[in-house]
Structure formats: C-alpha cells, structure tokens
C-alpha cells in the first residue's frame, strides 16, 4: 500500500498544480470581469490569462510525461484541453486564429493585434508562473524543473518538414473547429490526436503562443527557424483552411444530408 501511494504521489502533486493554475486564472478572470469595464482592456486581460493557463499547464504536463510517460501525458492533455473549452471565455490564445478571424472579417485588425500581443505576453511569463509552484519542492522532479533553465528543441526533422507538420496540424484543427457537430469532447480528443501526430517530429503545437512558451530559445533551434516553423506554419495553415474549409466541409457534411434525404425518400415510399 505504501509503495502504491508513493508511486501515485507525484501524479497527485501534478494534478494539484494544474488545479492551482486553473483556480488562480479563474479568480483573475472574475476580478477582471468585475473591475475592468473597458471592452478592449478586458479582451487583452483575458488573452493574457488564457495564455498563462495554457502554457503553465503544459509545463506541468511535461513533468507528468517525465515521470509516467506519454500515456499519462495523453490523459493529462485531454483533461487540460477539456478545461480550456469552458474556462477560456472569449479568449483565443492563438495569434493564428486571430489572423484567420481577421481575414473572415469576424475581428478587427486592432483587436486581432491586441489579442495576439497579450497572448504572447502571457506565454512569456507562464514559465515563471509555473516555477512558483515548483519552488515549493513538493517532489524531486519539481525541484529539477525549477533549477533547470535550459531546454532542448522538440524539432527533430529539417525545418521545412517541421513547417509542413505544423501547417498540416493547423489545417486539420481549423477544419474540425468549423464542423457543425464540433463540441468540447471533440475539441479535447482532437487536441490529443493532432498533438501526438506531430509530437515526435515538431512537438505538435499548431499554436504560436504555446510554441513560444515551450520552444523559443531552446538549444538546437535558431530564432529564424523557430518563427518559420512555429509561427509561419500555423498562419499558413490558417490561410489554407480559409480556402478549403467551406468546399471540403460541404462535401463531408453534405454526404450526411444526402443520407438523410435517402432515408426520408424510402420512408415516404413505404
């Protein structure tokens, strides 16, 4: 029994950290909603909070992966992705999504730039935020992460191949988001699947905000390579999805409508 408890202890601490992050971010949202009246200011604050929550929880998922492996990482990512869908409010936490909404005239240029800027700012401080909990030293791995200031790049292939992966992942993500039956469960499952598709190639981020927190400045990845793969890739993917989403989804979802019409026709004939 003692051995089992000690085996699960790090997982319980990591879960506690993730819940701590979510709770602090939710508290900040509540305070912002009560005190901040200016719409653009609230948008900026929400993007900042979303970025901190997204990136800080992913840092803790790295702890879980190191101790329990990638199966535990998948479960943790599913849980975190599920929480993002009902805590992010109107936040995008993704500059490439802001770009896409601007192109679709769903967002002004001013708002898109504001959201992207504060999202990146949130990503920039998220590591320091995660280190606050790690500094408590509740387990040895937390202390290792707290003391370690360096990281190795996730990109395991040539830059152009990494660019292709990040672009393709973004296209798939956008297509799913535009489907009629898209919901929180599909969002969480697709996040896990798309991430694992590129996890051992480029890291599977398909989000400039998250990749900025996790990859920028890591050993083995130059600045130009980072921006080409992890920023231009998602923006290119968003641009392509703008062109192909409607006709492709019309074919995919239109087939369901055709089946319904066939069933109705058979019912009437009977």
From Swiss-Prot:
Motif, NPA 2: chain positions: 207-209
TM annotation in the entry: 5-25, 59-79, 120-140, 153-173, 184-204, 220-240
Organism of derivation: Milnesium tardigradum
Matches recorded under Gene3D superfamilies: Glycerol uptake facilitator protein
The protein's role, per its UniProt record: Probable intracellular unorthodox aquaporin that may modulate the water content and osmolytes during anhydrobiosis.
Induction remark: Transcript abundance is low and expression levels are completely unaffected by desiccation or rehydratation.
UniProt keyword terms in alphabetical order: Glycoprotein, Membrane, Repeat, Stress response, Transmembrane, Transmembrane helix
Family designation: Belongs to the MIP/aquaporin (TC 1.A.8) family.
Protein name: Aquaporin-11
Domain commentary: Aquaporins contain two tandem repeats each containing three membrane-spanning domains and a pore-forming loop with the signature motif Asn-Pro-Ala (NPA).
Membrane topology: Multi-pass membrane protein
Gene Ontology terms for molecular function: channel activity
Catalytic reactions on record: H2O(in) = H2O(out)
Domain of life per record: Eukaryota
Glycosylated residue positions: 148
Gene: AQP11
Gene Ontology CC annotations of this record: cytoplasm; membrane
Span of the annotated motif NPA 1: 94-96
Subcellular location(s) of the protein: Membrane
